[in-house]
Curated annotation (Swiss-Prot):
Enzyme Commission number: 2.3.1.275
Quaternary data: Probably interacts with PlsX.
Organism, as annotated: Acholeplasma laidlawii
PANTHER family xrefs: GLYCEROL-3-PHOSPHATE ACYLTRANSFERASE-RELATED, INNER MEMBRANE PROTEIN YGIH
Pathway: Lipid metabolism; phospholipid metabolism
Catalysis: reaction(s): an acyl phosphate + sn-glycerol 3-phosphate = a 1-acyl-sn-glycero-3-phosphate + phosphate
Family as reported in the entry's similarity comment: Belongs to the PlsY family.
Descriptive protein name: Glycerol-3-phosphate acyltransferase
Membrane recorded as keyword: yes
Residue ranges of coiled coil: none
Length: 233
């Protein structure tokens, strides 16, 4: 097997394993002694943690989920200095693949029976590693929308969609990727990566289908609406 392909496969597996770390399960279990899978939407993600336990535990979970989406790309692109892992050729960057692997790990975590969250924070974290301004704007937008509407699901979908739009606009003004030393990333490569990002966003939106139904029925829980009694105090 070509060594480049082997390294890419190894990096994808490692990215998945990092993304699969279930902070949405660990934090409620560690600090409140509860299994988040038995509360709220029973989803293992920062959205459910924020809804069930409030901002004190939801925000750290969200940030850690972001971090695990960014970490694989940061390690491979900037710390290891191994361009052969994210370049198909001299100008084709595939680093978003590792962020996508982390997002899939979050959705289907091997550590908790292939259950997980909806990959909003993890996907945004991957974007931060590529373009911090757009990624951080996505996080800011999430909190603004979520806390103004009191619906985490609305904040998640709006932020995810907005990040994809901002990334596409970035391509048009040719400011999408952070430069990698001594490498020139092609415009075509940017388009390929943006298609991948768009597919991730579509997956995130699809994962919220039950939330859309509850919103239409008026049964979607608001932030802090149904905190667990005697636990959140």
């Amino acid at each position: 097997m070509n060594m480049q392909i082997l390294w890419i496969i190894i990096a994808i597996i490692c990215s998945y394993l990092i993304g699969a770390i279930p902070f949405g399960y660990i934090i409620p279990k560690l600090f409140k002694g509860i299994d988040i899978r038995e509360h709220g939407s029973k989803n293992v993600g920062s959205t459910n943690v924020l809804r069930v336990l409030g901002a004190k535990y939801g925000i750290p979970t969200f940030l850690l989920d972001c971090f695990k989406g960014a970490l694989p790309i940061i390690i491979i692109r900037y710390m290891l200095g191994m361009p052969e892992l994210f370049l198909i050729s001299d100008t084709y960057d595939i680093s978003i693949v590792f962020g996508a692997a982390a997002a899939i790990g979050h959705i289907k975590s091997i550590y908790i029976g292939f259950k997980g969250g909806k990959a909003v924070a993890t996907g945004v974290g991957a974007v931060i590693a590529i373009n911090p301004i757009i990624g951080l704007s996505g996080i800011g937008l999430f909190f603004i929308v979520a806390f103004s509407t009191k619906y985490v699901s609305i904040g998640s979908v709006v932020a995810s969609f907005s990040v994809a739009v901002m990334m596409w606009i970035g391509v048009l003004i040719k400011e999408i990727w952070i430069p990698v030393p001594n490498l020139t990333i092609s415009y075509e490569s940017q388009i390929i990566n943006l298609v991948a990002i768009s597919l991730i966003v579509l997956l995130i939106i699809y994962m919220h289908k039950k939330n859309f139904i509850r919103l239409m029925n008026g049964t979607e829980n608001k932030i802090g609406q149904k905190k667990i009694q005697n636990i959140t105090k």
